[in-house]
Amino acid sequence: MRSELIDVGTGSREVVFDLTSICEQFVTAEAHQAQGDGLLHLFVPHATAGIAILETGAGSDTDLLAVLEELLPRDFRWQHRHGTPGHGRDHVLPALIPPHASIPVIGGRLTLGTWQSICLVDTNVDNPQRQVRLSWLPS
C-alpha cells in the first residue's frame, strides 16, 4: 500500500471541496505499477469533516450544505461547546458523512459514475486547513 497526505485549504466557510482531479492524478501515478487495478481509499483525520461522493456543479453541493444546516443547525443546542457558536454540530457531521470512502480502480481509472465526484465536506469554519489521506491498495 502507498499513502499520501494532501493539504486542502477550505477557508473560513462551509464547503464541499471537489477532490476528484487530485484523486485521478494520484491513481494515475500509482495504477501503472499494479496493472491498473486496485482500490483508492480516502480518509480525513479530522473529527469535523467527511468524504462524500455526489454530483457537483449543478447545485447538489449547495443543496447538501443546506440540508446539513437543517439537520444540524448552528445554534446552542449542542453539548460540545468550544469554538464558534454552534460548533458542536460539526462534531456530529462525521456520523452522517463518514470520514472515509473507497473507490474501485479498474484499468487505471476510478469507477465513478458519470456525474459522481469525490468531495471533502467541511462545515467547521474554525479550521481553514484540512488534510486528506489518499491510499492506494493494488490488486
List PLM regions with ranges:
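Active-site histidine-anchored catalytic micro-motif
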Residues: M1-S139
